[in-house]
Each structure stands twice: as structure tokens, then as C-alpha cells.
Amino acid sequence: MGGGDEGLQIVIFLHPPDSFTVYPTPTPNMPIDIEELRAFKGGDPEKVRESERRRFNDPSRVDTVIALDEQWRKCRGDADNLRKAKRLVSKQFQVYAKEKKDVAPLRAQAQEFTDKIAAKEKEMVDVAAQRDALLKQLGNFVHDSVPVFEHEEAPDGTLQNAIESKHGWETRRVFPDSKDQDKEELLKRNAAPGGGPDGAMLKHHQLLQRLGGYNPEAGARVGGSRCYFLKGAGVSLNYALQMYAQNFLVNQDYTLLQPPYFMRKDVMSGVAQLAEFDEALYHVGGGDETEKGEEREKYLIATSEQPICGFHMNEWIKEKDLMANPIKYAGVSTCFRKEAGSSGRDTRGIFRVHQFEKVEQFVICHPEKSWEQHEEMLMQCKTFTQSLGLSYRVVNIVSGDLNNAAAKKYDMEAWFPGYDDFREIVSIAFVVLGWLVVVGCGSWFTSIAILFSPCCFL
């Protein structure tokens, strides 16, 4: 850990800093620690390049980051040498004063060193910003068990995600042995408010409409596309399912945590990828008049994991405590998403909507317990889904569709008879962060594993 005693803000490192000189470096949230790229300190740049290849990213970015890091370290060395030279000049002041010599030349020399140090420190900050911006774009190490494909589906429509397990059954009464064009026609007919052809199964939103619990037309008039009203039985079902999920997780020693629904930009930038800012996040302008700068700029949360990442911001977690007891939260929140990249997709039904409720597992654990915890969370999701009587399958997501933070991700997909297809209901992402803007662990060498998954949502 690094920090200062003279009024300096504590900066949390999960690897020892190169020296105890405190530099004004940024602290973004990055899946890859810069130490992984420093071969002279035991890092393995080729391992990072290979992981980028698995993600179908350009591995040359790794070399650009290494070059910028070398430039930053040279700047730091130059700044240290200038400080040493300035200290020598400062010592000469005492000698000149005793001998009653003119100290004006020394003052000029000291000022020259001061100016050079300031310029070099500014260069350090600029280079670090460039380096860290690129470092943020590097993805976490892809786990060896992840299927290496660029997309979830091959050009011929074949699923490339690995199916890990299945539970229940698939009832295909809607489109038995039908051709694609027949299937498309039946989809259109089945979308009618009264249901589909004889023997067809109604979709979930059609059932809810028949119960008087769902009104998308009124929602669109009030909030625009992908908005809806829940009414009567729909509201009751929503809250009942949330409470059921909360009680389920509390019984598994999770602590309920309801976060604020918006976050400061500087905190959000530590937990969300830049692409999400435009595609997923709603920007909230204005802010409290007492707030200044970035504190006034906020974003609505897309998932409770974002604010929960900041719950322990600037706190110290002892390694032995984390080893003994992982921190387990059940995040309960409304979520807001722009779905900017979903134009024309899933326009009917309660899919890809702008607002929904979610109960989520969120675990901070020691890396040595991380994969064990990941599997435990998957088992919790299976048990929960089975308790609802749903059929599902678990798929291991391909490397090309993992976000930068995830080393591995499971999706649970429930069988939707009305759509004759599996649809995602749960994602369980595995994230190991070498250093974090949000939390530190009491050890020089320890990283932290953060795992999260929605337990349920409507």
C-alpha cells in the first residue's frame, strides 16, 4: 500500500510502488496491472498479448503501453535526478551563508531546477494519462476454460458458446419442424393480443397483458419506446419475485444493500468501460449547487454492481479477513439502460427495456478462493432458478464477447416456450483486478476477486 502522512490522500496499490516518492498518478480501474507488462520485475507481456489475441483484439496495443511506461519511468528517473541536484544546491546555501558569499547564483540555479522538475512532473502526468488510457482498454486474462471464438454464433447460426449444463425440458409446440419462413409467419401471428395459432404458447408479456398486469402502449406514450406500466398483478409479481430473491440470498449469508441510483462521473469511470457511457448509461446534468466540477456530473446506474464497487472506496480490507470471510452483498436496485445498440431488436415484450428491477449477487473475495466462489455463485443461481420451476441451460460465453473486466462469464438462459428459444436471465462474471480505484487489500502482493451476477430481474 502507498500513502502519505502529511495531509496526502491515500492512494491504494495492490503491488508495491517502485519507490516511496509520491507522484500525482491517476487511479483508474484497470483489469491488467501495469506490473504485468514490466518484464524486468517478473511480468509477462506475452501472456497479455496472448490474452488479447483470444479476445480478437490487436495485441500491438500492449507494446504501445510498454513504450509509454518506459517513457514514464525515464521521466520519473529524470525528476529524481533533478531533485538530488537541487538538494545539493540547497546544501551549498549553508556553506555560502557561513562564508558570507553571494547566494544569488545559487537561488537562480535552484529556481532553474524547480522549473525543470515541474516540467518533468507535468510530462510524467501527461505520459501516465496516455499509458493508463490504453491500459484500460486491455482485457483481463481470459481463463483457459473459455471457448475461443469471436462471436457467440457462427455465420451459419451455430452456437459457439459452450453449453455447460441443462435443467428441465424444452417444449416445442409452437414451431414443430417448421421452415424459417413459416416460423417467422407464426411469430407474427403469435404476437397478436389474443395469442397465436391453436396449440401455440403465449409469450410472457401476452400472459401478463391477459391478467391486466402490463401496458406497453401507455408506457410508450409517457416514457417513449421500451417503456411500460406494470399494473395490479404485474406489480405484485414484480415485488413478490424481488422479495423472494432477497430472502433466498439472505438465507445464504448475503447482506442486503440498496445503492443510490446515480453515481458521480469520476466514480463511474472507475467501474464502467468507456463504451458503456454512450451505449448504456443515462447522463444526469445539473446536480446540487453545492457540488463542483465532476461531482455535479452524474450517471444513472445500469446495474447495482457499479455503485457497490464504490461502497468500500478508500477503505482498507485486511487480507486475513478476506481469506476467512468473503464480503457478500445482495444488491437491490432499479437499473437504467439506454440500449443504444439495440435498435430494432426485441421490440416486443419485456426485453431490453430502459428500466427494470434487479436483485444481484456481489462478492469480494481473496483470489485463492475466487474460482471456488465463482462456482458457488453459479450453484446459487441454479438452485434459485430451479425453485421457480424454470427450465434453463448454462453457457460458457466465448472470449470475443467478454467485456474487458471479465476473465470468464457464465450465462444462464431460461427456456421461453412462447419464443421457442432460450433467453438470458442471469450472467455470472468473474473479475480479478490487480489494483482498484475502489478498494485495497492489506498486502503488497494481493489482488482482489470481484464476482457478480443478477439473481433475478423483471
What are these regions (language model features)?
Residues 1-5:
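Intrinsically disordered, low-complexity regions enriched in glycine and serine
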Residues 6, 11, 18, 22, ...:
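Acidic, Ala/Val/Gly-enriched low-complexity intrinsically disordered segments
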Residues 13, 20-23, 430, 445, ...:
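Aromatic (phenylalanine/tyrosine) cluster motif
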Residues 23-184, 188:
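N-terminal alpha-helical targeting/anchoring segments
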Residues 58, 168-435, 440-443, 449, ...:
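TRNA-recognition modules of translation machinery and tRNA-sensing kinases, especially anticodon-binding
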Residues 164, 448-451:
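Short stretches within intrinsically disordered, low-complexity N-terminal or propeptide regions
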